[in-house]
């Protein structure tokens, strides 16, 4: 029974590290792949937020409810 707890702990550790695989987008292709839109100056829609950059100073915006 103790081995079951050990296996569960290892499984949770592996899953926790794999959940953080998504990185912040650094270019336009990565932004669109992550479901975002490149905006000119700021995120224009009320329910969007910046979560990366398409270029220098150009935010990648995505809806909050995704």
Curated annotation (Swiss-Prot):
- The gene name reads GAL8
Question: Disulfide bonds, which pairs?
Answer: 31-60, 38-54, 43-61
* Protein keywords: Antibiotic, Antimicrobial, Defensin, Disulfide bond, Secreted, Signal
Q: Which GO terms describe its molecular function?
A: CCR6 chemokine receptor binding; chemoattractant activity
Provide the free-text tissue specificity comment from this protein's UniProt record. Expressed in the liver, kidney, gall bladder, testis, ovary and male and femae reproductive tracts. Expressed in the ovarian stroma and the theca and granulosa layers of the ovarian follicle.
Q: Where is the signal peptide?
A: 1-19
Q: What name has this protein been given in UniProt?
A: Gallinacin-8
Output the Pfam families linked to this UniProt entry. Defensin_beta
The species this protein belongs to is: Gallus gallus (Chicken)
The subcellular location is: Secreted; Cytoplasmic granule
Keyword Disulfide bond assigned to the entry: answer is: yes
GO CC field: extracellular space
Q: Which family does it belong to?
A: Belongs to the beta-defensin family.
Q: Give residue ranges for the propeptide.
A: 20-25
**One of the protein's GO biological processes:** defense response to bacterium
Q: Which InterPro entries match?
A: Defensin_beta-like (IPR001855)
Q: Per the entry, what induces it?
A: Induced in the theca layer of the F3 stage ovarian follicle by intravenous injection of LPS. Expression in the granulosa layer of the ovarian follicle is not affected by intravenous injection of LPS.
Role, per record: Has bactericidal activity.
């Amino acid at each position: 029974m103790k081995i079951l707890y050990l296996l569960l702990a290892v499984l949770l550790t592996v899953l926790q590290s794999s959940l953080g695989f998504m990185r912040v987008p650094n270019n336009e292709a990565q932004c669109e792949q992550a479901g975002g839109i490149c905006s000119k100056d700021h995120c224009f829609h009320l329910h969007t937020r910046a979560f990366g950059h398409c270029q220098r100073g150009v935010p990648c915006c995505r809806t909050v409810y995704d």
